[in-house]
């Protein structure tokens, strides 16, 4: 019976893990066992934060829209409600971009909404 040795496989697997852990502090970048745990945890954080990123950006867009809408005498919820009532379908990302970078277009949008809401 031939004896199976895993030293080459184990060494390459350890090297792969340690390569992914470069830049980590202390033993996390030098010791396989600690580096493996750090990489697993980093992956969990990355997965969680990819989901949170979408929520955070939506909150940011809404706060930008609300801040500019209040300058023109509308609250955020009135603005969105009247947009849908007047059949203007624009997502919050584009609306926030209009509100921050192109004030004239946003003002035209608000005036259009005010006309249709009466």
UniProtKB/Swiss-Prot annotation:
GO terms for biological process: ribosomal large subunit assembly; translation. Keywords: Ribonucleoprotein, Ribosomal protein, RNA-binding, rRNA-binding. One of its GO terms (molecular function) is structural constituent of ribosome. CDD domains: Ribosomal_L20 (cd07026). GO terms for cellular component: ribonucleoprotein complex; ribosome. Pfam families: Ribosomal_L20 (PF00453). Disulfide bonds: none annotated. The keyword rRNA-binding applies. It comes from the Bacteria. Belongs to the bacterial ribosomal protein bL20 family. HAMAP family: Ribosomal_bL20. Binds directly to 23S ribosomal RNA and is necessary for the in vitro assembly process of the 50S ribosomal subunit. It is not involved in the protein synthesizing functions of that subunit. This is Large ribosomal subunit protein bL20. It comes from Blochmanniella floridana. The lineage of its organism: Bacteria, Pseudomonadati, Pseudomonadota, Gammaproteobacteria, Enterobacterales.
